[in-house]
């Protein structure tokens, strides 16, 4: 898997640590399909982070309203992947 320096960014460099609050939650959309939503990611790198998470999970997804939406329930492994991307464990909330 790619390391943070291989994909060319460290999200915490762009944000103050007190403001780098990432919220992960599971929602059910059309036809009760699960969607994992991720809020609080740096907007300048949103597309790059979304692309990397979709690749790592082998899932479809999109960016909508400043959130990353991943098809399926990925809460079990998402925290580990966000930590690998450089986010602090203290600033990741799983709802």
Q: Where on the chain are the PLM-derived regions?
A:
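A generic structural motif
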Residues: 66-71
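Long, charged, low-complexity intrinsically disordered regions
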Residues: 1-51, 55-56, 62-64, 76, ...
């Amino acid at each position: 898997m790619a390391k943070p320096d291989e994909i060319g960014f460290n999200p915490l460099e762009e944000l103050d640590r007190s403001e780098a609050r990432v919220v992960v939650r599971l929602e059910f959309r059309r036809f009760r399909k699960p969607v994992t939503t991720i809020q609080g990611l740096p907007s300048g790198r949103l597309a790059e982070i979304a692309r990397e998470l979709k690749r790592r999970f082998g899932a479809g997804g999109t960016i909508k309203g400043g959130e990353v939406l991943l098809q399926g329930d990925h809460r079990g492994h998402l925290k580990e992947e966000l930590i690998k991307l450089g986010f602090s464990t203290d600033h990741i909330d799983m709802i």
